[in-house]
Amino acid sequence: MIATVILADSIKEAIEKIKSSSSDLYELRADSLKDYSKLELLEPYSEKLVVTIRSKDEGGFKELSDEKRLELYSKFLEIKPRYVDVEFRSKIKDEVMEIAKRVGSRVILSYHNFRETPPFGVLYNLLEDMESEGADIVKIVTHASSPKDNIRIIRLYEFADNLIAFCMGSKGKISRIFSSMYSPITYVALDKKAAPGQLTLEELRVILKILGEGR
């Protein structure tokens, strides 16, 4: 499935962007919002929503305390989004996963490294640790400093099915393309890119058409 990343100042703007795009899913980067009122307006789109409130340490747009993030996750989970994304290293991980499972939302447990792509052994151990938490999908994203980093991250697909793994940055685009064919969810930009090297929806569709994997 393709998830278009939605960056917006308000819920109203987020809905306008959702309506302007045709996508399987929409990742609402709630950490980009300035106004959290009227969350209930998102309920008609809940089956297509991936709610992410990214921490500043892992690429979030602003500093939010753990208490505030947990409060926001709880409010967003009241509309029962299809997926909720929370960081593996987050102190509120267990609470968010518990609430999500109680309301029937699926959990994406994520790890982001903006500095490097660790050695394969480190990545493999990380994958095992993350899988043991019981999330529906594991997401591992690293920074590519060289083309070889793509190979390390792609190798993870040998050992997991419900995995999203790719490298960020201009040197990581090949892993994003590979991920689009083997991951349960592929992230694309609508207008403003949320991460280095991210493809737009149209760019991805052109690439998949060439590869015979059109969606």
Swiss-Prot record:
The keyword Lyase applies. The keyword Amino-acid biosynthesis applies. Gene3D superfamilies: Aldolase class I (3.20.20.70). GO terms for biological process: 3,4-dihydroxybenzoate biosynthetic process; amino acid biosynthetic process; aromatic amino acid family biosynthetic process; chorismate biosynthetic process. Pathway: Metabolic intermediate biosynthesis; chorismate biosynthesis; chorismate from D-erythrose 4-phosphate and phosphoenolpyruvate: step 3/7. Its EC number is 4.2.1.10. Belongs to the type-I 3-dehydroquinase family. Involved in the third step of the chorismate pathway, which leads to the biosynthesis of aromatic amino acids. Catalyzes the cis-dehydration of 3-dehydroquinate (DHQ) and introduces the first double bond of the aromatic ring to yield 3-dehydroshikimate. This is 3-dehydroquinate dehydratase. The lineage of its organism: Archaea, Methanobacteriati, Methanobacteriota, Thermococci, Thermococcales. The gene is aroD.
